[in-house]
């Protein structure tokens, strides 16, 4: 199999995001229920990172949802470790669920975090 860079790159830019972001990068894509789901990292104006979500039927033309998919926790156990952002998500399908590994960034440095979803609507 020969892999070629898509000549229409980039397939997603900050102009495609319906909320204010400074960047779009470091995406992961998986096929879920016949559609492509992309989770991507963005920086907000305050420098914090969030994870956005976009969907596509063909893997080239993506539509970004109106709200971010994963934002830093503001309360609970994760808030202390996500205060500067959530970054660089990876999507790992396993037995009908998707395990999401990502970097939680805070004054304590970078830590590995884990979340999961079945439907890319709700996250545990």
Model segments located where?
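Beta-rich carbohydrate-recognition and catalytic domains
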Residues: 1-22, 26-84, 92-124
């Amino acid at each position: 199999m020969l892999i070629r860079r898509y000549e229409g790159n980039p397939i997603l830019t900050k102009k495609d995001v319906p909320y204010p972001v400074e960047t779009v990068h470091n995406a992961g894509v998986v096929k879920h229920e016949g559609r492509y789901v992309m989770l991507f990292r963005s920086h907000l104006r305050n420098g914090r990172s969030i994870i956005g979500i976009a969907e596509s039927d063909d893997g080239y033309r993506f539509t970004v949802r109106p709200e971010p998919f994963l934002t830093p926790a503001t309360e609970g156990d994760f808030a202390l470790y996500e205060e500067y952002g959530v970054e660089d998500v990876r999507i790992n399908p396993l037995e009908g669920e998707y395990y999401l590994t990502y970097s939680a960034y805070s004054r304590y440095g970078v830590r590995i975090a884990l979340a999961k979803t079945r439907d890319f609507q709700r996250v545990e």
